[in-house]
Amino acid sequence: MTGFELYLKANTRAFDRYLSTFFTDGTHPDMGRYLYGPLKQFSDNSGKRHRPLICLLACEAVGGDPKQAWPAAAAVEHFHTAALVHDDIEDSSLTRRDEPCMHIAEGLGIAINAGDLALALVCGTVVHDPGLDDPTKIRVLAELVDMTTRTIEGQALDIGWARDGRFDLTVDDYLTMANHKTAFYSGGVPLAIGAIIGGGSTAQVETLRAFGMAAGLAFQIQDDVLNLVGTRESTKKDFRSDIAEGKRTLVAIHALQHADRRERLLEILSTHSDDPVLLDEAVEIMQAADSIAFARDYAHDLIVEAKACLVDAVPASRARDLLASMADFFVKRSS
């Protein structure tokens, strides 16, 4: 295990306990059944908690007390939960991490409503944080609002291109979409918020943000790669669903620009079939065009860029070492 993985393992359980305090039964017993219970169950199964935990690391890296950043870190995780609930609906996904998606298990209406509550918790958690002064709250809230807006903009590109059957896209188009959809909330903003709460300088906040944006984009590219070449068991997601859904990933866009069998790949991506034979054929075309290798190399270069930012941002410390380990983990993980 990397240092960052050990850090996640050591801290996830305590953070999970803290998150559970947000999922009460509300003002009526049935709210637990129809709202807070489903949301808690989904949140409990929503991943490694790297987003909130890197927020704490950023706070520590600039000399702050990471305990002060717990509510803001929880706000980031609430957003992640909301984004996943709504994303599963928009993508018509069936499972997430070996469990039925909320809209499958509880129904579409319950899932939309629970996702909306998670969004409300994002700002509410910070507003009601007794440990932050008002100027800091305003800065953190501004970051969260911008993060939410950018992520929704990225999702609009992703689902809009799919709806309109758009494959006339460039690598730069993909990078814009992925930066908005993933990098802001998976790296850039959690780190900026942690640095703000920790009392970091403007230069530290912005350099940690840049580190997080590069690492967050690499995280998304690695997700794209794992969806194609991992295994259903290791990814714990809908394996090769990106092909079945005709997703405009970096791999797909590169292959459509360079593959000898471009028209055949375009045909497969446009059929929205989950036939394993067709999925295998699409991956073979992508591999022959060196598109998967291109994506891996691009993600690796982003991590080199990210780690260079980190050295400039904060002095040597345990927290800085763990953030560097995080960047490596983002592109070496298998799920």
Where are these regions (language model features)?
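Hydrophobic, well-ordered secondary-structure elements that form the walls
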Residues: A252, A306, L323
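Short, amphipathic C-terminal "tail helix"
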Residues: L302, V314-S335
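An amphipathic alpha-helix signature
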Residues: D16, S20, L56, L119, ...
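N-terminal amphipathic/basic leader segments beginning at the initiator methionine
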Residues: M1-G26
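Non-transmembrane, amphipathic alpha-helical segments
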Residues: G3-Y7, F42, I110, Y174-N179, ...
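A non-catalytic, amphipathic alpha-helix used as a structural packing/dimerization or gating element
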Residues: A10, A14, E143, V189, ...
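Mobile late-domain/C-terminal helix-loop "cap" segments
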Residues: A259, E263-D312
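Mg2+-dependent prenyl diphosphate-binding active-site environment of isoprenoid biosynthetic enzymes
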Residues: H28-R264, D328-V331
